[in-house]
């Protein structure tokens, strides 16, 4: 439990630091901040993608890799399982978390929906990095319709 709280504090501070007012407003500030958060998440996802599946054989199917993310990776990061996994069987998957830990502490008013994406960028990178390590190129986007629920859309790139 203490690890979860420490991670939440670390994540909040990363977002706050990267979203602090930029003294050079012409440098692409917010877009660059999202890229930095995604990059950090990507690297963490790569490391977890190497370490967590040591007992399991290599994932040959996309669906098996996504199930691994929903169960094992999510439990390692957030001490819970993903609430839903849907697919169109054409390389697009939607992962749903009805109580995403990094959004639970936010208020539920509509004004907070604008702030939510910056709290999801790290996790998008995390999922993308883990999939990369497992051998799947992907594009991950997040959306929030009502707090604290969120959806991550994963599109597997066909080579």
Swiss-Prot record:
<keyword id="KW-0813">Transport</keyword>
<dbReference type="InterPro" id="IPR024096">
    <property type="entry name" value="NO_sig/Golgi_transp_ligand-bd"/>
</dbReference>
<dbReference type="Pfam" id="PF04051">
    <property type="entry name" value="TRAPP"/>
</dbReference>
<dbReference type="InterPro" id="IPR007194">
    <property type="entry name" value="TRAPP_component"/>
</dbReference>
<keyword id="KW-0931">ER-Golgi transport</keyword>
<comment type="similarity">
    <text>Belongs to the TRAPP small subunits family. BET3 subfamily.</text>
</comment>
<dbReference type="InterPro" id="IPR037992">
    <property type="entry name" value="TRAPPC6/Trs33"/>
</dbReference>
<dbReference type="GO" id="GO:0005737">
    <property type="term" value="C:cytoplasm"/>
</dbReference>
<dbReference type="GO" id="GO:0099022">
    <property type="term" value="P:vesicle tethering"/>
</dbReference>
<feature type="modified residue" description="Phosphoserine">
    <location>
        <position position="33"/>
    </location>
</feature>
<dbReference type="GO" id="GO:0005783">
    <property type="term" value="C:endoplasmic reticulum"/>
</dbReference>
<dbReference type="GO" id="GO:0006888">
    <property type="term" value="P:endoplasmic reticulum to Golgi vesicle-mediated transport"/>
</dbReference>
<keyword id="KW-0597">Phosphoprotein</keyword>
<keyword id="KW-0256">Endoplasmic reticulum</keyword>
<comment type="subunit">
    <text>Part of the multisubunit transport protein particle (TRAPP) complex. Heterodimer with TRAPPC3. The heterodimer TRAPPC3-TRAPPC6A interacts with TRAPPC2L. Interacts with TRAPPC2L.</text>
</comment>
<dbReference type="GO" id="GO:0048208">
    <property type="term" value="P:COPII vesicle coating"/>
</dbReference>
<dbReference type="GO" id="GO:1990072">
    <property type="term" value="C:TRAPPIII protein complex"/>
</dbReference>
<comment type="function">
    <text>May play a role in vesicular transport during the biogenesis of melanosomes.</text>
</comment>
<keyword id="KW-0333">Golgi apparatus</keyword>
<protein>
    <recommendedName>
        <fullName>Trafficking protein particle complex subunit 6A</fullName>
    </recommendedName>
</protein>
């Amino acid at each position: 439990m203490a690890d979860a709280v420490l991670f939440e504090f670390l994540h909040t501070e990363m977002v706050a630091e990267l979203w602090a007012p930029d003294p050079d407003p012409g440098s692409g500030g917010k877009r660059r901040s999202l890229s930095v958060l995604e990059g950090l998440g990507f690297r963490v996802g790569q490391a977890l993608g190497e370490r967590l599946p040591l007992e399991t054989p290599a994932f040959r199917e996309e669906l098996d890799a996504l199930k691994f993310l929903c169960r094992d990776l999510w439990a390692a990061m957030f001490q819970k399982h993903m609430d839903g996994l849907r697919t169109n069987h054409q390389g697009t998957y939607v992962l749903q978390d009805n109580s995403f830990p990094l959004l639970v502490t936010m208020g539920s008013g509509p004004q907070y929906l604008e702030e939510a994406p910056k709290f999801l960028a790290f996790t998008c990178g995390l999922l993308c990095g883990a999939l990369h390590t497992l051998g799947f190129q992907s594009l991950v986007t997040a959306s929030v319709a009502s707090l604290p629920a969120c959806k991550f859309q994963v599109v597997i790139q066909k080579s």
